[in-house]
Amino acid sequence: MGWSCIIFFLVATATGVHSQVQLQQSGPEVVRPGVSVKISCKGSGYTFTDYAMHWVKQSHAKSLEWIGVISTYNGNTSYNQKFKGKATMTVDKSSSTVHMELARLTSEDSANLYCARYYGNYFDYWGQGTTLTVSS
């Protein structure tokens, strides 16, 4: 019986039975100018409230732009000045999910949007991205 437990532990460790960190974002959005959209990022495989969550924009014509950050512990936010009044971040601890609402959309808002977990002084895990297309 003892060897069975040891072997199971070794196999479980080697095959990654332990939870893996994942950031799962909501699907693509195609919306008309002037409306708002709310996208989400669900964390799993770690203690959700131990890490702040950032949002980053990658438009077709520009490099990465930092939108802002939300504390998953208390909901405090900080935004890039450019996105104040445009982006609103919220957290739902019960579902380990952060949301970002973007208001008064224009074609300039079309982009790939990424959530990223902050660890120490770098982003250690990224969501797969949510494509936002604003078109009439």
From Swiss-Prot:
The lineage of its organism: Eukaryota, Metazoa, Chordata, Craniata, Vertebrata. Residues 1-19 form the signal peptide. Residues 20-135 form the Ig-like domain. SMART domains: IG (SM00409), IGv (SM00406). Keywords: Adaptive immunity, Immunity, Immunoglobulin, Signal. Gene3D superfamilies: Immunoglobulins. It comes from the Eukaryota. GO terms for molecular function: antigen binding. Pfam families: V-set (PF07686). GO terms for cellular component: extracellular region; immunoglobulin complex. PROSITE patterns: IG_LIKE. This is Ig heavy chain V region BCL1. One of its GO terms (biological process) is immunoglobulin mediated immune response.
